[in-house]
């Protein structure tokens, strides 16, 4: 509502529209900064943490996948796949990107 009053006063006082356009540009810049820090920056941090997790994986680590599978890494291939041992008789190949988190040692034995 105050925007209309400012416009009415500007017309009466004969001021130019340049001050109004500066405030519009200022609000757009503030909006873009808020958008960046609320959406893009957290996603970049999350991607960086996930990349560090993937690079730190070694044979014998116990992990959980995006689909909820718990297993021990048996083999890591050079082309980005992991042989995951779910139990003594079941092994699956999965893409490294599907690893969500690293579990503490001995988690699989306690289940």
From Swiss-Prot:
What Gene Ontology cellular component terms go with this record? plasma membrane
Membrane association type = Single-pass membrane protein
Q: What does this protein do?
A: The SecYEG-SecDF-YajC-YidC holo-translocon (HTL) protein secretase/insertase is a supercomplex required for protein secretion, insertion of proteins into membranes, and assembly of membrane protein complexes. While the SecYEG complex is essential for assembly of a number of proteins and complexes, the SecDF-YajC-YidC subcomplex facilitates these functions.
Q: InterPro entries, alphabetically? A: Preprotein_translocase_YajC (IPR003849)
TM stretches of this protein:
20-40
Q: Which top-level group of life is the source organism from? A: Bacteria
For this entry, the protein name equals: Sec translocon accessory complex subunit YajC
Q: Where in the cell is it found?
A: Cell inner membrane
Quaternary structure and partners: Part of the SecDF-YidC-YajC translocase complex. The SecDF-YidC-YajC translocase forms a supercomplex with SecYEG, called the holo-translocon (HTL).
The UniProt similarity line reads: Belongs to the YajC family.
Key word Amino-acid biosynthesis present in the record? no
The protein's predominant localisation is membrane
NCBIfam families the UniProt entry points to: yajC
Keywords, ordered alphabetically:
Cell inner membrane, Cell membrane, Membrane, Protein transport, Translocation, Transmembrane, Transmembrane helix, Transport
**Record GO biological process:** protein transport
Q: Which organism is it from?
A: Buchnera aphidicola subsp. Acyrthosiphon pisum (strain APS) (Acyrthosiphon pisum symbiotic bacterium)
